[in-house]
């Protein structure tokens, strides 16, 4: 059976769509166009097991975002997105595509990605260029992701420490913008999220 999203609405709080051929609506309270595909796969599996989709689809509303996986954290003025659980070129491109749909200013904070092999520098440079082409306003890179800064060009801010990254990104949040933080688990990019969260609480 072919399953597709007939109408999709991708907002800052989640992804809503009408699912074809079933004609039922569903919403996942997690962000990103790729989440619509994940919802389709889940419902196709449920349908194959004989479960009533009119009952199953609304259950998508109860999904709780996993920390570190496009988890939206509202700040007083801006929006912080914790996508630090892991990273590869494909997931970074998906994150960039979502961030590009947000109002300016938009800042991507990118850490190192592991296991990219001999093409690592080329792949990471291309991600920086991709962020530039998508209209991302600022790219902040941590050690291991410096090649992305070179690919991005003007507006890239390579830094050495988590504190520096958080300090630069805080300006975007103060102006009501969106900051998305991403990197491999080994890059410990959740440290940037924690610092930005603490700043928002006035610590």
What positions do the PLM features span?
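ATP-dependent carboxylate-amine ligase
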Residues: 29-34, 40-203
